[in-house]
Structure formats: C-alpha cells, structure tokens
A protein has these predicted regions:
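A conserved acidic beta->alpha catalytic loop
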Residues: 21, 28, 36-45
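A short, conserved alpha-helix in the catalytic core of glycosyltransferases
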Residues: 150-168, 173-203
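Short aromatic/hydrophobic "clamp" motif used to bind/position activated sugar donors
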Residues: 79
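Conserved donor NDP-sugar-binding/catalytic core segment of glycosyltransferases
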Residues: 90-128
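Glycine-rich, basic loop-to-helix element that forms the pyrophosphate-binding segment
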Residues: 57-74
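Active-site donor/metal-binding and catalytic loop motifs
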Residues: 115, 175, 197-220, 232
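A conserved hydrophobic helix/loop-capping motif in glycosyltransferases and polysaccharide synthases
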Residues: 2-14, 18, 25-26, 35
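Short, flexible, basic/aromatic active-site loop/helix in glycosyltransferases
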Residues: 127-150, 154
Length: 289
C-alpha cells in the first residue's frame, strides 16, 4: 500500500515502537524503509534481524538527504514520511486510503494528526518510552474530537511517488531538516497542487521530536537570531513560512475544499511588505549564508 520512510538517528528504542505500531495497527500491508543516520546504537543489526530494508549513511545526513535516499527504494505508488518517535494508532491507514480514493487523482498532500502532550490534540500517555502507556492510548484515542484541517505541513504526510519525484523530494539545503516540510509544500504549490489536508482520524502519538530536543542547541538548527530553516525559506521564496501558511495554505482552520490563490487584501499586502523588509535584513544586513 504505502512506502513508509523513517529517518532515524541513533534512536533505536523509539524506532522499535514505531515499527511495532505499524505492524500491529495497520489494516493494509506496507513497505517500511528507515534511513539510518550513523547507526552507532545497533539500528542496522536490528533492521537486518527483522528483514527490513533500509538505507544508511555513516554520518548524520539529516532528514532531507535520508528521506531522498530511502525514497529511491520505494516500490509502492505512495510515499509516507514518518518520524521515528511516532506510534501509529489503529485505523491510521484506512483513513488515508479512503481519502486517496475519494480524491481520485495524484495532486494532493495529506497528513495525519499528531496527538500527545504537545500534539494538535492532547492525550497524555507518557513523554518517553519509559513512561509510555500504550493501553491508555488505545483505550482513549477514539474519544478525541478534532476536525479535518486545512493547510497541513506536518508528518505523517502522504504524497504520490510521481509527485514526490516531480518536485525532487525534500530540499537538502534545509539540513538537518527544519523548514523542509513547508518548503516541500511550496514546491507542490508551484506545481499546482491545491489539496493540503490534515485528517482528524488518522492519528499518531508523538513523543515530541526526541532527537531534536536532544540536539536543539546545535548551530546547524539555530542561529543567534532564530531558526535557520526559516531564513533559508525566506531567502529561497521571498516570504516567511508564517506568511505562506497563513495566506496560501490557510493552515489549521477546518478543511472545506481545495485551496485557491490568496486574496490580496490589505492584511496580505502589509504582511508581504514585512516579509520583503525581513528578506533584505537577512540577506544584506544579517548576511545569512
């Protein structure tokens, strides 16, 4: 059904939970393809023992390069990007398949809904593998009441492999990965994709970016004036991620229909001017490279 690509960086115990949840809670059979960054924690031996195909770099290639390498091994028609600290709840794949069948073409970007202590819907079933309460999650996830939402940019996301290849996958200049999701959305927008939909009943529990928290002071992720990925996006596209999500993707409001071009009202024009001022500052005064 889907090729599930999972970049992982020395995070074996969480990866085991992620893969286990896919095997346990999926209605359909899926292809699982992790990309191992470094793999000094025994990840490669584990995947070999489970007969799971993978790609590997002996360095931390980040999310983008890892995704692109692993996606080349995909043999299904659909690429699904997942974090290694996800737990996939029952029914996740049936919801995606129903939506794909309903759309009837390949020009879409679909995502699930992350739940947890920091997700869109909160359900405290633990913050790490040591206090994870799987039973509580399985007993309560169906009680959550959320809506299908507009303008998703988050994992787990699903796109057709032809569309993935059309835009070249993730842009590797966003190493180690921050900002690469909205950049992918922008590339899809430029190729006339207008369905960006988050599905309320496609649920994954997220432990909360375990690896990012472990490395959140890395200069490759942050600069002294904020997030590096935001600056790369601004210099590449001439607008901020916040502007793109607000006026183009109209993120997080209830989903109604596929998107149209943004209305260029006063609020749009004023915000666009601020983007251009920010662009000039970052490029010529801050001299970000």
């Amino acid at each position: 059904m889907f090729s599930i690509i999972i970049p992982t960086f020395n995070n074996l115990e969480y990866l085991k939970i992620c893969i286990g949840s896919i095997k346990k809670n999926s209605e359909f059979e899926h292809e699982i393809i992790p990309h191992i960054n470094e793999g000094t924690d025994g990840t490669e031996d584990y995947l070999i023992s489970k007969n799971i195909k993978y790609t590997i770099t002996k360095y931390n290639s980040g999310i983008c390069e890892g995704m692109n390498k692993a996606a080349k091994k995909a043999t299904t028609d659909y690429i699904l990007y997942a974090h290694d600290d996800f737990y996939f709840c029952p029914g996740w794949d049936t919801e995606l398949k129903k939506e794909v069948d309903k759309i009837g073409h390949n020009d879409f970007y679909l995502s699930g809904t992350m739940i947890g202590t920091t997700g869109i819907d909160t359900l405290d079933c633990g913050t790490n593998i040591n206090n994870f309460n799987e039973k509580k999650l399985l007993d309560n996830y169906q009680k959550l009441n959320f809506y299908d939402f507009q303008g998703s940019t988050w994992a787990p996301h699903l796109i057709h492999k032809d569309i993935w290849n059309r835009v070249g996958g993730f842009s590797e200049e966003f190493y180690p990965g921050t900002g690469s999701d909205p950049d992918l959305n922008m590339k899809l927008w430029k190729t006339n994709v207008r369905i960006f939909k988050g599905l309320a009943k496609c649920l994954v529990f997220h432990f909360g970016s375990v690896v990012t928290r472990r490395n959140n002071d890395d200069i490759k992720i942050k600069t002294e004036s904020g997030n590096k990925g935001n600056k790369i996006f601004l210099l590449k596209w001439g607008i901020t991620i916040k502007f793109f999500k607000k006026f183009y993707l109209r993120s997080d409001i209830p989903y109604v229909s596929e998107l149209t071009e943004p209305k260029k009202a006063m609020n749009y024009l004023f915000s666009l001017i601020l983007c251009k001022i920010n662009y000039l500052y970052v490029k010529y005064i801050y001299n970000f490279k």
